[in-house]
């Protein structure tokens, strides 16, 4: 199964994307069955993130046999790990491309666009992020994957900033900048968790939607970036 085929469009729940793929004849029967199971797992997580998905509910919904489930996944934990890792992989590596006219406009801010994409995805798929927080302690591969993606994002910001200022960072400057950006990543993750999972009252009033949340985070990100220009 190729995860590279998965692109999460604006406002799309991940289970809906997986359902599209399970009906896509471009994939073989085995892959479509796997997508079907994953869609059911994702839907259960999204609808009830505090609960572990149920194999029985999947079998009832799909009409598949227990043997078919176990032919695809060793157990429910493996199915959850696959769903979450596929979601984050699609979220970070297969973002819809920005239109060239938009990217070239004077008011285009790539940091805001990245934050907006992440905030909108978080708002729509909050249950998957909540489940990640719950299971990451015993699924270290998920944690390492997110750390790698965060590190890649930090490196892209540093490279972009170096181009704007016209010279590379020294080793000491780069280390300081990396540390500050990783703090920004951690702050953003926690802020989004409080806003969209725990529905913090003050954050909800101050940032009523994903667009407002992205603007608020971007302001802090850009203040940090400007100090290194």
Language-model segments: which ranges?
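Membrane-embedded alpha-helical bundles of multi-pass transporters/translocases
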Residues: 66, 70-71, 84, 88-92, ...
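C-terminal peripheral helix-coil segments that are non-catalytic and often amphipathic
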Residues: 1-21, 158-163, 182-229
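Hydrophobic alpha-helical connector segments
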Residues: 6-7, 78, 82, 96-124, ...
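Helix-turn-helix
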Residues: 44-78, 82
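Short hydrophobic clusters on alpha-helical segments that form packing/core surfaces
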Residues: 33, 37-45, 87, 91, ...
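Amphipathic alpha-helical linker/stalk segments
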Residues: 21, 47, 52, 83-111, ...
